[in-house]
Amino acid sequence: CSLPAGTTELDIPSELISLGIQWTTLQLDTLHKEFPNFTNIQDKQMCLLDPRGETELSCTDINNYKVCILGGILGSHPPRDRTKELKDKYPGLLVGKRLGSLQMSTDTACRCAHYILDKQIPFENIKFIDYPEIRFSKREAVEMPFRYIIDENTNKPILPDGMLKLMNKDSDQSIDDLF
C-alpha cells in the first residue's frame, strides 16, 4: 500500500507486518521502483475501490488488475468523494470498482475484497449489516456509520481487534475529559 510520506514500519500494526503487507511512501505510478516484482503498471491495471465506481468488484477481477487500492481516503460520513482526488491525479491508470453502494470501514473493505478476489465469494453472497448499533449499557449505544461484514458464527459485525474495548473506554469518559 502507498502511505503518506514520513510513515515508518513503527506506524503499521504488527499484525499487518506479520501478514507480509507491502507498503511504500512512493506515488502509485512508481510502485515498480520499490517493488521489482511489480512491472511498470500500465493503464487500467489498478483497481480503485470506490463507492462511485461504475461496476461491482467481481471474482473474475483477480485476473484483470495488478493492484487493488482501498481505504485510501476513508473518513467522512456521509462520504465526500475524496477518492476523486486519486482518480484525478492518475487518469487512465485506475479503474473504479464498487463494493456495493455504502461506505465500509477500511478493514471491512479489505476483508470484502479478500472474500471476492481470493476466496472467490461473489459480493451478493457476503452477508452485511449496515450502520450497526453497538450497545454498552441499557442507556448507552453507538451507531457505527458504515457497512460491516457479519460473522456468521456470532451474527455480529466483524470489527477490528480492540475496537470494542476502545469504544467502551471512550463511553466511560465525560465531556470534561475531552479538554
Where are these regions (language model features)?
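S-adenosyl-L-methionine/SAH cofactor-binding core of RNA-modifying enzymes
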Residues: 2-79
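Glutamate identity and glutamate-enriched acidic tracts
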Residues: 9, 15, 34, 54-56, ...
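Helix N-terminus capping/helix-initiation residues
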Residues: 27, 58, 105, 159-161
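Short glycine-rich, acidic/polar surface loops and turns
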Residues: 81-83
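Structured adenosyl-cofactor binding patch, chiefly the S-adenosyl-L-methionine
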Residues: 85-134
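C-terminal accessory extensions appended to soluble enzyme cores
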Residues: 118-179
